[in-house]
Amino acid sequence: MRKPMFMLFLFVLALAFAACKKEAVRLAYPETKKVDQVDDYFGTKVADPYRWLEDDNAEDTKAWVEAQNAVTFGYLETIPFRPKIKDRLTEIYNYPRYSSPFRAGEYYLFTKNDGLQNQSVYYIQKGLDGTPEVFIDPNELSPDGTVRIGISGISVDDKFVAINRSEAGSDWSEIRVMEIATKTELSDRVRWVKFSGAAWHGDGFYYSGYDEPAAGEELQAKNEYQKVFYHKLGDPQDKDKLVWEDKEHPLRYVNAGTTEDEKWLFLVLSEGTSGSEVWIRDLARANAPFTLLVKGFDYDSYPIEVVDGKVLVHT
C-alpha cells in the first residue's frame, strides 16, 4: 500500500505546483542587425556579421547596449525577492575592513573601508601612535566614483609614492606621484601603462608601457611590444628613456624591479599566466648590458634580492 500512496502524493504535489506556477515571462530582445562582413584568412573566408559591435564608441553600439540593458534590468526588477537579497547582502557586508599597514619612513599607510564604501580609502599616520588621516579617497576622484587607484611603488628615500590610476574599469592606467609628507600630487603624468608597477631608482622609476594608440583606438588597438622605460621626476613623458624592448616577441609582458640598494635592475618576462624568464642589469655600471639569469618559461621565477653577490630567486 505504501507505493500507491507515495505515487498519489507525488501526483497531488505536481498538481499543486502546476496550479501555483506563473506563466513564464517572455523577453522581447532587441533586434541585432547583421552586416555583410567577410574576412579572408589565407584562402578561408570567415563571416563576421557583428563586427560593427567592436566599435564601442559608435552611436549604434551605444544604442544597442542601452537596449540590452533595458531588457536585462527590466526583468531583474520583476523578481519579488530581489530586494530581500540586496538587504541581506548589505547587512552582512556592512562592517569596517582594514588592510595590513606598510611603512614609508616615519609614516604608515593602510586602507580602510567603513563598510559600504565602493572603494577602500587610503589613510596615512605618522608613527604607530599617530592620528590617521585620509591620504587618497578614490571615491572622490570622479563624479561616478569609478576611478581605481593602487600604490605601485615607494621611493627609496621614502619621500614619494607612485600611484596607478585607472578609469571606468579600464586596464589602462596612468602613473602619478605624490609627496608622502605633504600629501601633495606632483605634475608627473605617465600614460599608456598596463600591468606595471613603478620600480624606483634615483630620482625616478622604471615602468612598463606601450606605444600610444591612435585616437579613438584606445580600447581596440592591439597591445603588442610592451617596453620598459625610465621616468625622471619632473620630466614630460616624451623625455622618458627606453630601457628594454623586444621586437621579436610582440605578446610578451615585462615587469621591472630594483633591489633595495638600487644597484640591480631585474626584468621578469612572461608569455601568459605562468612561467617567467629573468634578466638582470648592473646599475652601478653605465650602460651595462642585461644578462639572462633564468632562461625559458617552464617555471615561475621571481627575483627577490641580491645578497653578498648572490641573487635570491623565488621559484
Where are these regions (language model features)?
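Generic N-terminal leader/processing signal
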Residues: 1, 19-20
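Beta-propeller folds
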Residues: 20-315
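Bacterial N-terminal signal peptides that target proteins for export
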Residues: 1-7
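Bacterial N-terminal signal peptides
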Residues: 7-16
